C-alpha cells in the first residue's frame, strides 16, 4: 500500500520519521523550480541510494539533495513499500537515517549561524593543508574539491558549485568550515603571507652564506 501526501502538510523529516525502518522507495516530486523528481531508497532504517530522475547521485550530490528536501515546504511525496533495487556496484550509501537527520539538522542550524559570515561566491580559496582528517559531509566535499583548491589560482564557491553540481550557498558553507579548521586561506591573503616570509628566508640565506665565507677565510 502506497503512502502519499503533500510536503506542505508533512515535511520530509516527518515523513522519514513516520516510515521508521520500513523498506521501499520514497519519491519526491512537483518541486518548485525542478523538472526532475527525486527517489530515495530506504531499507531497514538506512538510505541505500538517491536518484535524480534516473541518475544515481554520488554521496556529495545525494547529501546536497537531501539537505534541500529537508527544508522544502512545497511538493508532494509517495512511498512505495518493498525491497528497493540494489544500487550500481560501489555506489551504495548505507546511511543510518537517524544519524543523517541529526547531521542535516546540525547543518541547517549552522547555515543560519554562519549566514552573515559566508564568503562571497567569487572569493578564491587555496588549500594550505592537504593531508587532513575531516568528518562527513565535509570530507566528501574536500575529496571532490581538493584538485581545484590545490591549484595555485585556487577556486571560488561559484566555480566549485558549477563543477560539482552543488548550490553556491552550500559550497560557501563548506569553504567557511574548512577555513575555520585552518585548511584554506583566501588566495590573496595566502600570497601576502608568502611574500612576508620571503625576505625572512632571504635574510637567513645571506647570514648563512656570510657565516660560511667567514669560516673559509
Task: Label each region the model flagged.
Residues 1-217:
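Acidic, Ser/Thr/Pro-enriched low-complexity segments and adjacent helix/loop capping patches
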Amino acid at each position: 500500500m502506497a503512502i502519499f501526501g503533500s510536503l506542505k502538510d508533512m515535511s520530509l523529516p516527518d515523513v522519514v520519521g513516520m516510515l521508521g525502518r520500513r523498506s521501499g522507495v520514497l519519491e519526491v516530486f512537483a518541486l518548485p523550480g525542478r523538472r526532475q523528481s527525486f527517489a530515495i531508497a530506504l531499507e531497514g532504517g538506512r538510505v541505500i541510494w538517491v536518484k535524480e530522475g534516473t541518475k544515481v547521485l554520488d554521496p556529495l550530490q545525494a547529501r546536497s539533495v537531501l539537505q534541500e528536501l529537508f527544508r522544502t515546504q512545497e511538493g508532494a511525496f509517495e512511498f512505495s513499500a518493498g525491497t528497493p533495487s540494489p544500487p550500481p556496484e560501489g555506489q551504495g550509501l548505507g546511511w543510518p537515517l537517524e544519524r543523517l537527520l541529526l547531521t542535516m539538522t546540525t547543518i541547517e542550524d549552522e547555515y543560519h549561524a554562519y549566514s552573515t559570515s559566508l564568503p562571497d561566491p567569487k572569493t578564491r580559496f587555496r588549500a594550505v593543508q592537504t593531508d587532513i582528517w575531516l568528518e562527513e559531509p565535509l570530507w566528501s566535499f574536500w575529496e571532490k574539491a581538493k584538485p581545484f583548491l590545490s591549484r595555485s589560482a585556487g577556486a571560488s564557491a561559484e566555480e566549485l558549485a558549477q563543477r560539482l553540481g552543488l548550490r553556491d550557498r552550500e559550497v560557501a558553507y563548506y569553504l567557511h568550515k574548512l577555513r575555520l579548521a585552518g585548511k584554506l586561506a583566501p588566495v590573496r591573503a595566502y600570497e601576502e603571507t608568502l611574500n612576508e616570509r620571503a625576505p625572512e628566508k632571504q635574510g637567513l640565506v645571506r647570514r648563512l652564506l656570510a657565516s660560511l665565507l667567514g669560516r673559509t677565510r
